[in-house]
Amino acid sequence: GCDTVFTTGGAQSNHAALTAACAARLGMKCILLLKRRGVTEHRGNLVLDELFGAEVRLLDMDSYDEIYAEMHRIGGTLEQAGHKCCYIPVGASTALGAVGYVSGAREIAVQAMAAGVRLGHIVSATGSGGTAAGLLLGAGLFLPGVKVTGIAVDSSPFDKIVPRLAGEAAALLECPFQPEENAFQMVEHMGPGYALPNPEDTPYIEELARTEGNVLLTTGAKELGAFA
């Protein structure tokens, strides 16, 4: 098995923080190659990453292709020293990564049925496409007629990425993937940039905190703000 795991994302990547947490639990070394863009202070998930024991490298690179090359360069040196490395792409947006959210869609279906709630839409912030892909496939399997809406919090061609990943996840699970017409749509609400708060969303963050006691992260605030 592997003893070292690499992944990447924005400086405040939730995926990166979760990877660091899982690596800590499994006793693996975790190396995070994160984009420095937008970092003005050491806060949020950067603190958690280091708390979990991850080695954090902030890179002045905007292209993930460049970051992947650096990832494999570092990993190659470690492998020559006898380590075994696992490389996870941004957001774990692969067929296997999407499968986790197929299971999530099933859980949503079970809970909705138990609560007697009839769903029409599932809304998810979309930063790399894996979550939306898994929900799209899962909705088709467990929630017929329910549409998936992705809120773009980064700039990528999600209208192509999400259906492709959903199809690859279906192939991995050996299940059919024939989405209904208009089963998936994207709404752009990135604001100033990935992980950067949109000032227009501040009233919704405050209202939810003061009426429900719930605190939204930047991505969650953009989900809510997109429909306000």
Placement of each model-derived feature along the sequence:
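PLP-dependent amino-acid enzyme catalytic core
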Residues: 1-228
